[in-house]
A protein has these predicted regions:
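Helix-to-loop transition at the C-terminal end of transmembrane segments
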Residues: 91-102, 174-179
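Functionally critical transmembrane alpha-helices in membrane proteins and complexes, commonly lining
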Residues: 2-59, 75-84, 105, 109-115
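Juxtamembrane transmembrane-helix termini
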Residues: 26-29, 56-60, 95-98, 119, ...
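Transmembrane alpha-helical segments and their boundary/interface "anchor" motifs
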Residues: 37-40, 57-93, 103-110, 135-141, ...
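Generic alpha-helical transmembrane segments of integral inner-membrane proteins
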Residues: 14, 18, 46, 82-90, ...
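Aromatic-enriched alpha-helical transmembrane segments of multi-pass intramembrane proteins
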Residues: 6, 23, 105-138, 142-244
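Residue-level detector of alpha-helix boundary/anchor positions
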Residues: 11, 32, 64, 72, ...
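Juxtamembrane loop-transmembrane helix junctions in multi-pass integral membrane proteins
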Residues: 3, 28-34, 69, 73, ...
Length: 244
């Protein structure tokens, strides 16, 4: 594992935490904290990088089967998800005004991690609301083995990423802002480009690691990356959400 990723996880986890604190105190209700939602995208990108880092070679060399990969991923997601879901049910006093049938529908959607496919807040944020991100991860894991042949050709993977990202931007442009969260932000299908971006970064990393990059060159790349991120973070409020 790449040790420097641990510090990045910490930083972006804090960003996500800060973005959710606006309900606690108006101190957090500022642009600086609100932009922390980009941390969610970071974790989806990181997922694509880590999964490719750990499994792409194994699939290419037939050292792991699709079934074994999926079983391992399910074992990683579902036990803890179900535990937190049942705790939420027990302690959350979750009630739906329309009655028991709707409660059961929402519960089953959450139980099976299909709630984020339904563009209604009372579904994708029901019970344990952060579980919508697990819906996305579940789709990423399902798709990954089928993306391996494309990933071997960097240009094909880049093309798939660009086309899907452009289509999503176009779709968001014609979607009322009140519907963007349900149709585009939490939807696992429209989050797939984040995962593809992570896979792309791994292909880049895999190519560069064999080259003799000096500490100076590495520092320049690092500083440029941080500067680009900070520029986005500071001026993001000037850019419509559709294009962010």
């Amino acid at each position: 594992m790449i040790n420097t990723l641990t510090s990045l996880r910490f930083i972006f986890a804090l960003m996500v935490f800060g973005a959710h604190c606006y309900t606690i105190d108006k101190f957090f209700d500022t642009h600086f904290f609100k932009e922390g939602f980009v941390g969610v995208s970071f974790f989806f990108v990181l997922s694509g990088f880590i999964i490719a880092y750990n499994y792409q070679k194994k699939f290419s060399e037939n050292k792991i089967t699709k079934r074994a990969f999926w079983v391992a991923r399910i074992a990683r997601i579902y036990p803890l998800h179900w535990l937190t879901l049942f705790i939420a049910v027990a302690l959350g006093n979750y009630v739906i005004a329309s009655g028991a049938i709707d409660w059961l529908k929402h519960f089953l959607a959450s139980l099976t991690l299909t709630n984020a496919y339904i563009p209604k807040a009372d579904y994708f944020f029901s019970f344990n609301s952060p579980s919508w991100s697990l819906c996305c991860e579940q789709l990423f894991y399902l798709c990954f083995p089928f993306l391996i042949p494309i990933a071997k050709d960097y240009k094909k993977l880049l093309c798939v990423f660009l086309v899907s990202a452009i289509l999503i931007v176009i779709g968001m442009h014609f979607t009322p802002e009140t519907d963007i969260k349900g149709y585009w932000y939490v939807n696992p299908i429209t989050r797939l480009p984040d995962f593809l971006a992570g896979m792309l970064l791994f292909q880049l990393y895999d190519r560069l690691k064999s080259k003799n990059i000096t500490a100076y060159q590495g520092s320049i790349i690092e500083i440029a990356s941080i500067a680009l991120f900070l520029a986005f973070y500071l001026y993001a409020a000037e850019i419509p959400k559709v294009y962010r």
